[in-house]
């Protein structure tokens, strides 16, 4: 539009049909290169980097306080197998307590 007064002639509506776009993906994956385990992709990358460096990996763990249900965060450095053991313990008979409940 040009000027201070709005005219219908100033509004140009030219609708030009776009060529049809193919939105399908023709990518093919080689499923043999992927294993069917339940591990997260980021865990795999982190483990690969740690194995290459010959180090253990640092994991961040979040769980609820068993007394007040607030979030408790831990950072542990361990192997993947030992973190799985800790995860199993937290799901069964080990509970975490936040610092406020522990002080009472």
Curated annotation (Swiss-Prot):
Disulfide pairings: none
Motif Nuclear export signal per record, residues: 83-91
Residue spans, zinc finger unnamed: 65-101
Short sequence motif named LXCXE motif, residue ranges: 23-27
Primary location: host cell
InterPro entries, per database record: Papilloma_E7
Keyword Transcription regulation in annotation: yes
A Pfam family assignment: E7
Region called E7 terminal domain, residue ranges: 1-47
Entry keyword annotation includes Transcription regulation: yes
GO terms of biological process kind: DNA-templated transcription; symbiont-mediated perturbation of host cell cycle G1/S transition checkpoint; symbiont-mediated suppression of host innate immune response; symbiont-mediated suppression of host type I interferon-mediated signaling pathway
A molecular-function term among this protein's GO annotations: zinc ion binding
GO CC field: host cell cytoplasm; host cell nucleus
SUPFAM superfamilies per record: E7 C-terminal domain-like
Keywords: Activator, DNA-binding, Early protein, G1/S host cell cycle checkpoint dysregulation by virus, Host cytoplasm, Host nucleus, Host-virus interaction, Inhibition of host innate immune response by virus, Inhibition of host interferon signaling pathway by virus, Interferon antiviral system evasion, Metal-binding, Modulation of host cell cycle by virus, Oncogene, Transcription, Transcription regulation, Viral immunoevasion, Zinc, Zinc-finger
Gene3D superfamilies reported for this sequence: 3.30.160.330
Subunit structure: Homodimer. Homooligomer. Interacts with host RB1; this interaction induces dissociation of RB1-E2F1 complex thereby disrupting RB1 activity. Interacts with host EP300; this interaction represses EP300 transcriptional activity. Interacts with protein E2; this interaction inhibits E7 oncogenic activity. Interacts with host TMEM173/STING; this interaction impairs the ability of TMEM173/STING to sense cytosolic DNA and promote the production of type I interferon (IFN-alpha and IFN-beta).
Record function comment: Plays a role in viral genome replication by driving entry of quiescent cells into the cell cycle. Stimulation of progression from G1 to S phase allows the virus to efficiently use the cellular DNA replicating machinery to achieve viral genome replication. E7 protein has both transforming and trans-activating activities. Induces the disassembly of the E2F1 transcription factor from RB1, with subsequent transcriptional activation of E2F1-regulated S-phase genes. Interferes with host histone deacetylation mediated by HDAC1 and HDAC2, leading to transcription activation.
UniProt similarity note: Belongs to the papillomaviridae E7 protein family.
HAMAP family linked to this entry: PPV_E7 (MF_04004)
Domain notes: The E7 terminal domain is an intrinsically disordered domain, whose flexibility and conformational transitions confer target adaptability to the oncoprotein. It allows adaptation to a variety of protein targets and exposes the PEST degradation sequence that regulates its turnover in the cell.
Name of the protein in question: Protein E7
Taxonomic source organism: Human papillomavirus type 26
Recorded name of the encoding gene: E7
């Amino acid at each position: 539009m040009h000027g201070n007064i709005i005219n219908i002639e100033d509004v140009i509506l030219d609708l030009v049909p776009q060529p049809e776009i193919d939105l399908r993906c023709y990518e093919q994956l080689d499923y043999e290169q992927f294993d069917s385990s339940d591990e997260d992709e980021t865990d795999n990358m982190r483990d690969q980097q740690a194995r290459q460096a010959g180090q253990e990996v640092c994991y961040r763990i979040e769980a609820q306080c068993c007394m007040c249900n607030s979030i408790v965060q831990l950072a542990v450095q361990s192997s993947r197998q030992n973190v799985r053991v800790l995860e199993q313990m937290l799901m069964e008979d080990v509970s975490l307590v936040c610092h406020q409940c522990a002080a009472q």
